Amino acid sequence: PELRGTYAALGCAPVVDYLRRLGVTTVELLPVHSFLNDRHLAEKGLQNYWGYNSLGYFAPETRYSASGKVKEFKTMVKTLHSAGIEVILDVVYNHTCEGNQLGPTLSMRGVDNASYYIVNADNRRYYDDFTGCGNTVNLEHPHALQLVMDSLRYWAEEMHVDGFRFDLASALARESGKVENLGGFFDAIGQDPTLNRVKLIAEPWDLGHGGYQVGNFPPGWAEWNDRYRDGLRGF
């Protein structure tokens, strides 16, 4: 019980054996990047246990670690791999926990707000929010793009994960606020010798105009399909 909800628990022998008996070949984890509790939840004494509120793109969330050490995550991945089970991460690069213009200044806002986020052209105090979370990371800017690419390579090369599911992936394609041929981020992925070999899964929409992009992602990408999902629900 003391390991419940931790990386060590997922990598312990009884859990791995159970997954193998089920015939599981891949596990996809909800976001494990270091994240922040939403203010409105904290004020009610609640916690964000989904993780879609990223703070640090290179740090495993410590509340999921029994030991508090990065090695625990790597050991979990190694143990699952030894059982023939791949590990895919759900990643949230479309926004951060800094929220809208009233949110806390914790990372990119304090470094270079107008470079790392898509700011409103008419009033740069405000953000163009294509994510519904207060801000949108600006992958059209080379520094923001490099940050995300470096993070992905770190998790693939150092932490040895097998792939990524990209939350609100259309937001990663926005250039000048529009989804234009899925943007330079996807070109960068395709040209990267590490990332073009891992599994890539898109949630192919965001909340902005033109964001619904099911069927339009590049070769090598898998996509969630909400219409197929809804069709299955009808049976």
Model regions and ranges:
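Conserved alpha/beta catalytic core and glycan-binding cleft of carbohydrate-active enzymes
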Residues: 160, 173-176, 181-235
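Substrate-binding/active-site clefts of carbohydrate-active enzymes
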Residues: 2-160, 165-191, 210-211
